[in-house]
Amino acid sequence: MSTSYSFLLAGRELDVFLSFSGKIALDVDFGYDLSRNGIKAFKSESWKESSFKPIDLRTLEALTESKVAVVMTSDEEVSSVGFLEELIVIIEFQEKRSLTVIPVFLTKHPLDVEKVSQIFPERAKIWRTAIAKLDNIAAQYSFSRNLAVMHGTHRIKQIADDIRLMFLSSASSDFKGLAGMDRHMKALYALLALESDEKVRTIGIWGSSGVGKTTLARYTYAEISVKFQAHVFLENVENMKEMLLPSENFEGEDLRSVNHEMNEMAEAKQKHRKVLLIADGVNNIEQGKWIAENANWFAPGSRVILITQEKSLLVQSGVNHVYEVGSLRYDEALQLFSRFAFKQPYPSPDFERLSVRAVQLAGFLPVTIRLFGSFLTGRDKEEWEATLLKLNAKQGKDIKEVWKIMEALEDKDIVEASQR
């Protein structure tokens, strides 16, 4: 496969890609234990596909955005061509070191692809090769086999916790070295006042799209979550009010029956625990006000962080401690760009003028700078000039439009990965 994935990987927004061999594997509830730990997961539905076709673009994009792929298989006879084709791409990503693969087998038995191989004999060899490679990868993980032997909930939680530790252990290297992070963290720590347990404190983080609000919040979560008895990172608070009901509704009730993402918070509220709650994507005053007003459900010393694009929303919600994540400074932006374009702190002398131009076109926004730098790395001056000229004509576009432009400039199609 000749495709280059580097510029796509720079724009990652997901953490974990969940792949399933079939419905039995899908029934294992993995997403809850990941999401409550602030790990954003994508559940693939490729297992539903029984006919031969390339992986759909959304699934392929999710795979390129993810750092980890969890492949869950059962002893059922594999009839899903979609799962097998997806597995081929997952293994290729793993071999290129752009993805960590964690196999989870629900039984000791190997996958059986005999019948589906009879229907598509030309694919049989490559499917069996991918399965063999998955077995080899499994040898690295003690929890890959015998999942069904132990209590399902316990084992799933153990695996989710292992993945969480994997992300926390790499948080410093992923985030701390980013340009401007130390400056942001110093200011945010002052607002958090973690040394004080006198009361619940609500903090607001705001800034324009792509400026790095979520990156800052995720790093903060990784750094301080261990200080709290309960913690959760909510990616979407659209239905939070319905999810976290008044405490009397939980008395004598099995908390697992309530929306999974909020179980931890509901239990913490009931037991008056010290909580860290980070709510991303707060987009209206009702949401902000409701979260801020009800923060006192939790024990003194709890911290609630709201993330939004609108400062006025925070003010009107009664949030007194507010931090703006502004665009990167000139030197920070150039340093970040150089890290992705040249794998060093500063631009190569021959490319300094072009690097400054690229940073300006990126609007000093971290997510766009990472995309530009990753796309341009290894290219000659002529290619830089042509790329920047096309991007200059598209100034003012949002990040999704920029992504499409970058894809259009790439002369190889990433869908080749699913057709080998």
From Swiss-Prot:
Residues 185-406 form the NB-ARC domain. Pfam families: NB-ARC (PF00931), TIR (PF01582). Its EC number is 3.2.2.6. Induction: Stabilized by low temperatures (at protein level). The active site is at 86. Residues 12-167 form the TIR domain. The keyword NAD applies. It is found in: Cytoplasm; Nucleus. The keyword Isomerase does not apply. PANTHER family: DISEASE RESISTANCE PROTEIN CHS1 (PTHR11017:SF529), LEUCINE-RICH REPEAT-CONTAINING PROTEIN (PTHR11017). Confers resistance to low temperatures by limiting chloroplast damage and cell death, thus maintaining growth homeostasis. Regulates steryl-esters and sterols accumulation. Limits leaf necrosis associated with virulent bacterial infection (e.g. Pseudomonas syringae pv. tomato DC3000). The TIR domain mediates NAD(+) hydrolase (NADase) activity. Self-association of TIR domains is required for NADase activity. This is Disease resistance protein CHS1. The gene is CHS1.
